[in-house]
């Protein structure tokens, strides 16, 4: 059973920002943001044609500055938020804004291969998330499962919740919390939990991971020294409400039960350099992607701590079949965790990995040299999970 070859797309600029187009569940579409100091930065809207194994793209100009992070609205596929650098009074500031893809490109019309970025259209600015009073933005993330009207941003040591009003053309700061402690504490990343009616978020600062209840804007747990060095990324298990994955500069990926934070449930040590990105599969949470500056992407099968640790358990209607074939009885032993694959198509640091929002068996990875690689879960494993 031969697996499909990876599909590679090259951007002309360096890049580290990648997201799936969350609200798009039919087309396989990713958004990539560039980092260039000399030229106008761009958002590449990447459509993957699964049947023909080819990539189509649109290029949109992002005049505001080099893009450090990008997040797609969960409700409107044409709306996105970016964190970007700009120079103001000879100082570099990291800001955030909400943008709309121009109407002409919303229907999935694509450039011909001869088109260049010189005639590319620009993103339409909807509103700024003005954090001037709070410092530099570290990240921005949308409320999951929401109507696209709520955003979380982290700026220096502030956790900020924004409401978008008037068709997303106005942002209002609805609540905030402050990270307090010794020294200059700064948030590095954050994630909004899809569980508990979206009332909890997790943040990382230095080596610690903290949980917050956004109703009271108070801290509800703190994992001190979660990693030996800086925590780079977080992700919530979509199917197990207390489970959280983290990765960091200690080259490790850790899995936590936030009800018992004294030690991780599981630790992976497969990367040889900083781990920048960790992502659970949205449908099959045993599938976990990680990307690292060792230039590798690793796909792990963390089935023992997944929502289906025994695989598919037997339904009552299957019992009669099993009596005829007792040797086919499904095992009740927990399945073993394993590394499914190590993907080495990149030659530079892999800063982002993302699952497709339309196809649960397809994922993309982005390295700093502007190389986007699209891969698939091996067919044998796919059928093993499904059957």
UniProtKB/Swiss-Prot annotation:
PROSITE patterns: WD_REPEATS_1 (PS00678), WD_REPEATS_2 (PS50082), WD_REPEATS_REGION (PS50294). It is found in: Golgi apparatus, trans-Golgi network. It comes from the Eukaryota. Keywords: Golgi apparatus, Repeat, WD repeat. Residues 311-339 are annotated as: Disordered. Residues 315-326 have a biased composition (Acidic residues). Its main location: Golgi. WD repeats lie at residues 132-172, 182-222, 226-266, 270-310, 345-385. GO terms for biological process: endocytic recycling; protein ubiquitination. GO terms for cellular component: Golgi apparatus. PANTHER family: EARP AND GARP COMPLEX-INTERACTING PROTEIN 1, WD-REPEAT PROTEIN. May act as a component of endosomal retrieval machinery that is involved in protein transport from early endosomes to either recycling endosomes or the trans-Golgi network. Belongs to the WD repeat EIPR1 family. This is EARP-interacting protein homolog. It comes from Xenopus laevis.
